[in-house]
């Protein structure tokens, strides 16, 4: 696979890929009213997203903020979310289109938000490291970066993405 990937926008403009993005993006969100509305008429919304992409008239909405309680870490989190149509569908389309580019250079042990990897994958690695530890380590350091995504320089991120993706429309 080449180092840079192009023609992602054309890939996104395929109706089958749009339908796949709607189904994939709606997973675990069936309780949301806006998602149920889209799932009730998948073909109609597929055509609407297709028209937005073909005419290049998609304009992203401002994200809304909401506080949720995260049971796994036992703390409150402030999340930002966008409406499922059209923003959520287009976001999912972009991720599906760029996934091969990102996965190509990713370390095998990057587990977060990667299909087929996750908690079990990371746990298996940790158990293996502890079991085969030759030094006899006794301590573990668990760390978390506070508000990581807020600290990312967006201009630098876009510059880095431009080195991986050579599609100006994307």
Show where each model-derived region lies.
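Short, compositionally biased low-complexity segments
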Residues: 12-28, 61-69, 95-101, 131
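Non-catalytic, polymerase-adjacent accessory regions of viral genome-replication enzymes
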Residues: 1-47
